[in-house]
Amino acid sequence: GLVISTGERPVSTISSEVHLSYRIRPLSHHFSFIHAVHRIHRNRPGKRVLTPASSNRVTLTLPSDAATTMLASGRRLAVRCRPSARLASSQPLAAPADPDGLSPPARRLVDLEDRHGAHNYAPLPVVLARGSGTRVWDVDGRSYYDFLSAYSAVNQGHCHPKIVGALAEQARTLTLTSRAFHNDCLGEFAEYCTDYFGYDRVLPMNTGVEGGETALKLARRWGYEVKGIEENKARVLFAQGNFWGRTLAAVSSSDDPEAYGGFGPYMPGFSSLPYADPAALRAELERDGAHICAFMVEPIQGEAGVVVPPDGYLAEVKALCEQHRVLLICDEVQTGLGRCGTRLCSDHDAVRPDVVVLGKALSGGVLPVAAVLADDEVMLTVRPGQHGSTYGGNPLACRVATAALEVLREEKLAENAQVRGRHLREGIEWLRPKGTSGNPRGARAGASAVGCDCDRGRRGGESGVGCVSHHVR
């Protein structure tokens, strides 16, 4: 049977047929629709019970709001239910005019963005207005479980009270000084961050892509000053399928035509190798290791579709880099900070990268904060005037980032991610029809990042689930 509770007000006071369209949201970004005809019957004051005109035994309890859980044919799905028409006869009224099913307030906001904003994104037709923990609400008050987590930027949950409290308290005191002066927050953040991750120094920036750029500048500088590479000859290796941003340096390292097409000329000194292929890395290091200063890699590739390398991959990469005196840069912007069941995803292979790039959840999603971690040999190659940011290391960001790291530690969110990750993969596997392909790929043994390969030959598979990630709270 199917039971949906939708609020307090009755759907209709008439007694006839009602045509309903159910918008079903599985664990993906894609929708399917079921249209059914039901007859209305009085049940008790304030409620109406609808039964189908067909022989299928389905019961709907429909007084008004919207979201709940649907149990049908043994499959649990998140669902939205809204009458597409209310009838005083057997003839349905006209369907809603909005092609995306948006309310007038939501449509107005979407149109404003479309009319005045750049068209560099194609969002889903949902206009969010509020968030708390694992849930978000749209402008019409409907709630959703957030399975995207702002690309892992809200690992601590939306609007975590401790992080928001730190933001509000510091915002009333001092927000920005620039690095022309010391401030009373940067030193404390630097101490906490370096102690937490076990590095000599941290260089704070604003966004993940700035962190990546910073790591590359450090690597090149180290290559010239420490390794002794001839000036302007330093090379950096990347993995194919990488994604770390959309600046010119980032797209220069990309092999995605959508990312780099039409933006040349590109940054020199960048080369890419197959991901999770130590043999390819070994061959390139043996061929030209004297000119290679760094290999930058994601422990698990996110944008490429949650691509998980074999166990031991990073350990083998680290050994090769040490053998050829090449820095290992781990891009932990998306995989770090508890998302994969450990502080850093590289911890799964017991690897300590030479340079670590952090971002996204470093602020719990309340403002942009990024950081680069390294030891003295690498970090101290950059001197005053050679790198910086007006907002990097500002008091507001430092207080927020410290609070965000404290939440990760105090609430044991990395450990919780292991438990939630197992639950998520088990649930997705339970939803998958028997005999079909599309097993969920878990990010390591326990993690809250999961990818699903969908069978394109089956109905709905052409859209499928690209990447499903679950909060660690």
Whereabouts are the PLM-identified features?
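Compositionally biased, intrinsically disordered low-complexity segments enriched in Pro/Arg/Gln/His
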Residues: 23, 39-42
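N-terminal mitochondrial targeting presequence
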Residues: 37, 53-94
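Intrinsically disordered, low-complexity terminal segments enriched in Ser/Thr
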Residues: 32-34
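Low-acidity, Ser/Thr- and Arg-rich intrinsically disordered low-complexity segments
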Residues: 5, 9-16, 21-23, 28, ...
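Conserved N-terminal phosphate-binding loop of PLP-dependent enzymes in the Aspartate aminotransferase
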Residues: 88-473
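Ser/Thr/Pro/Gly-rich low-complexity, intrinsically disordered segments
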Residues: 1-2, 11-12, 40
